[in-house]
Amino acid sequence: MTYLEIEGTNHLSGNVTISGAKNAALPLIVSSILAKNEVKINNVPNVADIKTLISLLENLGAKVNFQNNSALLNTNTLNQTIAKYDIVRKMRASILTLGPLLARFGHCEVSLPGGCAIGQRPIDLHLLALEKMGANIQIKQGYVVASGNLKGNEILFDKITVTGSENIIMAAALAKGKTKLLNVAKEPEVVQLCEVLKDAGLEIKGIGTDELEIYGSDGELLEFKEFSVIPDRIEAGTYLCAGAITNSKITLDKVNATHLSAVLAKLHQMGFETLITEDSITLLPAKEIKPVEIMTSEYPGFPTDMQAQFMALALKANGTSIIDERLFENRFMHVSELLRMGADIKLNGHIATIVGGKELNAADVMATDLRASSALILAALAAKGTSKVHRIYHLDRGYENLEEKFKDLGAKITRLEE
């Protein structure tokens, strides 16, 4: 097993280039199932989740060429509609194949998903929506077995769901007639999926709002244009927190600051200043790091995927910070590891109270999920001594060239084999 060795209390400086968004690339790659032509996608991050999804598509018969952050996808050769457990178990996003496979072929079987062990993350909302569109759905031996010709309908999501919105948008693209979706997720990743489908000829209204109207093509495949994946706002936020926790000046390149409004607002409240251009953000050191109150919510609110990183940053603040996690249960699994480094954090249900300003000391810590592992790296950057972060396969699922990027900023970080 590999681990990261990190020497703390070093200043960072320089530039880091932000990769394409993993959470945008996943549904965009899946959307190639709706294409009549070969689809070229640029700025695709070379991370484990992307490779897992490509394996899944190849398993279904697609031809995929992925190199130099560009993916060339041909789904005309699809000859299989069963997404098998041994691939799906590695990653939740595999459930995204359900809507497009069903819409294109009229039947499919998709194993119930795996991925990070964060809360329940139920897929009932996906299934209820597909049933409303005329699908017959059964759960058999750990598989979602779906069949039927999809027809447009009005669908209200009881809760905002990002993957649910994406799945049903793709299903509605090939369905017969108009689908009206209410309480749709407004995340930039969902917006890009809609824009790409619109460019491919789909009639879709309300992009960027919580209400979409999609006029399905009744089974006719779409003609995709070449496009690039949007920058990863969570990766960007993580590097901003790395600059902040070491109180350093760093610049992020190839980033979209408008997608980071909530994160930047909290950094400003904590005493940091930023210089923003069309595609860069420079973080300036704070005179004093102030405590902060954060409540996670759906976009454009504060992202749950940045909660762990800000908890690490709050350990350096001069005072007591509060983090209220509203979206997922079990999303404080990093707390026990931060305590090993000398953190003062108290949990009460979904609320964490962080007393900052105490010295952090290096320790051996273990990552439990993708974003928790990045919080441990941030804490290690600020801790006195050399820390080891274990189970970093979680990091490899979502961060491209992580240690190289940190090294470019001057961090002392090494990947080693146990």
Swiss-Prot record:
Top-level taxon of origin: Bacteria
Chain residues that bind UDP-N-acetyl-alpha-D-glucosamine: 92, 121-125, 305, 327
Modified residues (2-(S-cysteinyl)pyruvic acid O-phosphothioketal): 116
Record EC number: 2.5.1.7
Keywords: Cell cycle, Cell division, Cell shape, Cell wall biogenesis/degradation, Cytoplasm, Peptidoglycan synthesis, Pyruvate, Transferase
Record's GO cellular component terms: cytoplasm
UniProt: phosphoenolpyruvate binding residues: 22-23
Reaction(s) catalysed by this chain's protein: phosphoenolpyruvate + UDP-N-acetyl-alpha-D-glucosamine = UDP-N-acetyl-3-O-(1-carboxyvinyl)-alpha-D-glucosamine + phosphate
Matching NCBIfam families: murA (TIGR01072), PRK09369.1 (NF006873)
Stored HAMAP family: MurA
Protein purpose: Cell wall formation. Adds enolpyruvyl to UDP-N-acetylglucosamine.
Protein name: UDP-N-acetylglucosamine 1-carboxyvinyltransferase
Organism: Campylobacter jejuni subsp. jejuni serotype O:2 (strain ATCC 700819 / NCTC 11168)
Gene name, Swiss-Prot/TrEMBL: murA
